Curated annotation (Swiss-Prot):
Keyword Mitochondrion part of the UniProt annotation: no
This protein's name: Alkaline ceramidase 1
Catalysed reactions listed for this entry: an N-acylsphing-4-enine + H2O = sphing-4-enine + a fatty acid; N-tetracosanoyl-sphing-4-enine + H2O = tetracosanoate + sphing-4-enine; an N-acylsphinganine + H2O = sphinganine + a fatty acid; N-(9Z-octadecenoyl)-sphing-4-enine + H2O = sphing-4-enine + (9Z)-octadecenoate
Molecular function terms, GO-annotated: metal ion binding; N-acylsphingosine amidohydrolase activity
């Protein structure tokens, strides 16, 4: 008796504009198939920087952790799901977009969070901590389908904890490269967040002056933040997990350029010197 209603509900989550979220950019201005043109195609940077960082960080991943490849794949999935969401403004697209972000942050936690920040009951065991993070993320994922606001609370909680860790580590370090990376990461993230909030809160103003691109600017800035954030976490992790090795920061395409994507090279310390 309930099958037709269930089918209608399932089909509705795939439908165009079935999400309650609608960004400032006018819909279907450039194509009948793409709801938000600039918000959709600005995600292409996720698909560029993801594979590029996998290539640049390959030596690091081979020596430290191959989980880096999984983190990069999740980053690219965020770009794909975000493209799908902004193309359709469907409820399913919204869920996939938000859940993929949650899993990216969770995977970063599992791989790079220093053991000194682990809960005491896991006793510094990264495997147990990763299991705890995975179980929590799975529960949050299922709850998101029941109550979508759960994911927003989860993401905000993680963001607050990350800021706390960044502040704590920044106070402890003396390495100029790491301090620079943390500063740039925070500035990029703050600029991206400002664009995101401004698009939501001041939409009527931006529409009056015909400037609809703040959310697409958020996509570009946050995709650039990813390489800086990854390298920052790798350097912090190395301080705790690889004290016998030195990580040298390089920038693609050239170290001498003012702007570039950071990556690290692991160097063996010569203990005979």
């Amino acid at each position: 008796m309930h099958v037709p209603g269930t089918r209608a509900k399932m089909s509705s989550i795939f439908a165009y504009q079935s999400s309650e979220v609608d960004w400032c950019e006018s819909n279907f201005q450039h194509s009948e198939l793409v709801a938000e043109f600039y918000n959709t195609f600005s995600n292409v940077f996720f698909l560029i920087f993801g594979p590029l960082m996998m290539f640049l960080m390959h030596p690091y991943a081979q020596k430290r952790t191959r989980c880096f490849y999984g983190v990069s794949v999740l980053f690219m999935l965020i770009g794909l799901f975000s493209m799908y969401f902004h193309m359709t403004l469907s409820f399913l697209g919204q869920l996939l977009d938000e859940i993929s972000i949650l899993w990216l942050l969770a995977s970063g936690y599992s791989v790079w969070l220093p053991r000194c920040y682990f809960p005491k009951f896991v006793k510094g065991n990264r495997f147990y901590f990763s299991c705890l993070v995975t179980i929590t993320t799975i529960i949050s994922t299922f709850l998101t389908f029941v109550k979508p606001t759960v994911n927003a609370y989860a993401l905000n909680s993680i963001a607050i904890h990350i800021l706390y860790i960044v502040r704590t580590e920044y106070k402890k370090i003396r390495d100029d490269d790491l301090r620079h990376l943390i500063a740039v990461s925070v500035v990029l993230w703050a600029a991206a967040l400002t664009s995101w909030i401004s698009d939501r809160v001041l939409c009527s103003f931006w529409q009056r002056i015909h400037f609809y691109y703040l959310h697409s600017i958020w996509h570009v800035l946050i995709s650039i933040t990813f390489p800086y954030g990854i390298v920052t976490m790798a350097l912090v992790d190395a301080k705790y997990e690889m004290p016998d090795k030195t990580l040298k920061v390089h920038y693609w395409p050239r170290d001498s350029w003012v702007i570039g994507l950071p990556y690290v090279e692991i160097q063996e310390n010569d203990k005979n010197c």
